[in-house]
Regions:
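Divalent metal-cofactor coordination and adjacent catalytic microenvironments
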Residues: 1-84
């Protein structure tokens, strides 16, 4: 992960157990790769919002597995993609 540190991720997701931490890291890596594949750059200017999106997407997937990404997160993804 380049957009967020493991410590930031664990705190945001309230991941306490080793199992939760491993899941959070795996999801965050997948989410980061998904954002990059959508053409969203990860650089000094986008890192704060990019990292927040990775954390929000990861928390949502941990709390609501299998559910669609909330509209608010999708809107922020589009905003970052087109206004970076």
């Amino acid at each position: 992960m380049e957009s967020v540190t493991p410590e930031e991720l664990f705190l945001y997701c309230k991941a306490d157990s080793e199992e939760q931490k491993l899941l959070a890291e795996q999801l965050a890596e997948s989410n980061e790769a998904a954002l990059l594949s959508k053409g969203i750059p990860l650089n000094q200017n986008t890192r704060p919002r990019f990292g927040l999106l990775v954390k929000a997407m990861t928390l949502h997937e941990m709390d609501h597995p299998g559910e669609a990404t909330p509209q608010g997160i999708r809107e922020k993804i589009n905003d970052l993609k087109f206004n970076h």
